[in-house]
């Protein structure tokens, strides 16, 4: 039987801060007729995030699927998915599928205690929903069904000292978005059909959820968290009464994110979303207490069926010093090897019991080259760092021009690359960093 950890002790001040920020913009908040999704994945600062592509698949009846810790029943058909994930686990921090569904998850602590027993991680639920759901609404159903059947639990970091939390999710497709917030097996969901919304590691659904767990209110009554009088406010009822320091910081980021969206309402573009995710003053682009933004993602989901969805990913830490690279699903897409971490098979510390007793080097090629270029420049002078950043932004501008060409149906130019777009962009970035290393970051004109 899994043991419960009292909510008052999770999270404790001895555990590093864990934070993420998710954003979605729908018309009329978006300038164009698109839905925009964005997420910063804030994780232990040395954790490597890889970009994984998995094609659609067919599976025989009775198949089992091994997730990070447990097995679940496999479905007959799975969709092609693009995942940005911590390299040690099965699931994903954020991702998209071939139908234009995007999902990101966040850590949350509530009055409902977390459990030490291994179950599905929130990141497993992200991937399972992407593989199984052709719409955001169906993804909500997939997650809540799996939550009810298998539960959520297990350590969410590669360390002997466990970090355990429950999850909130932001899910969207080209027509609508959903916020799904959980407290143990209990949950509430909100539907969004216009405007902008953000999440920052706290319950945010108040009254009149779109849907909710059938025992959500009766459980709160039974626990004495709600008296049954007046409107039922999910976030007020299930949130911790005494918030840890990290949750107070989440409130500040949540408010800052709301303000950044409000200031640009009606004019939110891909560039707007990139700038929000790079905002250091608010803490949205974070580096604090052993945690930092280890990967970032922005997706453009056009409402026109004739225009493809485009997903931009960094695959490297700190979006303010990284390059967003576009990906499009297509019949000839393959895994880009330079953003895939090495495999350790049965020797992987995640597969051994007790888990996480040793460490392995999970850095992929792009991560290594990015890290090397930044360190080489830092060892020289500020001018070298500024020169590198200018070169990164120049490369990203080329990537964004490519995106604009594809999104503009009136542009007759043939978008060369298509399925190879992400691969080409990764290759260019690798060449940039190799050149920097060879020149030892000497100051040159861009």
UniProtKB/Swiss-Prot annotation:
- Provide any one GO MF term from the record: dipeptidase activity
Q: Which BP terms in the Gene Ontology apply to this protein?
A: proteolysis
Which Gene3D superfamilies does the record associate with it? Penicillin V Acylase, Chain A
Catalytic residues (positions): 20
Which Pfam families does its entry note? Peptidase_C69
Q: Which domain of life is it from?
A: Eukaryota
Similarity comment: family membership: Belongs to the peptidase C69 family. Secernin subfamily.
Q: Mind telling me what this protein is named?
A: Secernin-2
| Annotated organism of origin | Xenopus tropicalis (Western clawed frog)
Q: Tell me the name of the encoding gene.
A: scrn2
């Amino acid at each position: 039987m899994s043991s419960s950890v009292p909510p008052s002790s999770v999270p404790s001040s001895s555990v590093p801060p864990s934070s993420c920020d998710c954003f979605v913009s729908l018309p009329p908040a978006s300038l164009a007729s698109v839905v925009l999704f964005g997420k910063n994945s804030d994780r232990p600062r040395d954790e490597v995030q890889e970009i994984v592509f998995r094609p659609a698949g067919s599976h025989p009846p009775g198949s089992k699927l091994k997730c990070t810790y447990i097995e679940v029943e496999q479905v007959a058909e799975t969709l092609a998915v693009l995942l940005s994930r911590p390299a040690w686990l099965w699931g994903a921090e954020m991702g998209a599928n071939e139908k234009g569904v995007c999902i990101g998850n966040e850590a949350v602590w509530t009055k409902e205690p977390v459990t030490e027993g291994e179950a599905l991680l929130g990141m497993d639920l992200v991937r399972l929903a992407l593989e199984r759901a052709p719409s955001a609404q169906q993804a909500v159903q997939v997650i809540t069904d799996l939550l009810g059947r298998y539960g959520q639990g297990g350590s969410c970091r590669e360390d002997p000292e466990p970090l355990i939390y429950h999850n909130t999710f932001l899910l969207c497709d080209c027509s609508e978005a959903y916020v799904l917030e959980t407290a143990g097996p209990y949950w509430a969901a909100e539907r969004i059909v216009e405007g902008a919304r953000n999440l920052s590691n706290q319950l945010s659904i108040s009254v009149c959820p779109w849907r909710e767990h059938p025992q959500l209110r009766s459980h709160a009554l039974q626990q004495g968290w709600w008296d049954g009088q007046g409107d039922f406010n999910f976030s007020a009822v299930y949130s911790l009464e005494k918030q840890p320091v990290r949750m107070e910081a989440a409130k500040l980021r949540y408010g800052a994110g709301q303000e950044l969206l409000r200031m640009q309402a009606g004019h939110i573009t891909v560039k707007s979303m990139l700038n929000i995710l790079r905002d250091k003053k608010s803490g949205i682009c974070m580096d604090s207490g052993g945690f930092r933004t280890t990967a970032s993602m922005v997706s453009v989901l056009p409402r026109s069926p004739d225009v493809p969805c485009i997903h931009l990913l960094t695959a490297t830490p700190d979006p303010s010093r990284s390059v967003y690279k576009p990906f499009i699903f297509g019949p000839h897409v393959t895994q880009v090897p330079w953003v895939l971490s090495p495999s350790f098979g049965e020797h992987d510390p995640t597969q051994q019991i007790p888990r996480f007793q040793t460490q392995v080097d999970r850095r992929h090629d792009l991560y290594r080259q990015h890290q090397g270029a930044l360190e080489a420049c830092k060892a020289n002078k500020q001018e070298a760092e500024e020169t590198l950043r200018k070169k990164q932004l120049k490369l990203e501008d080329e990537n964004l021009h490519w995106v604009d060409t594809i999104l503009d149906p009136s542009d007759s130019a043939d978008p060369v690359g298509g399925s190879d777009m992400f691969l080409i962009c990764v290759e260019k970035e690798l060449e940039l960093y190799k050149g920097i290393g060879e020149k030892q970051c000497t100051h040159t004109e861009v």
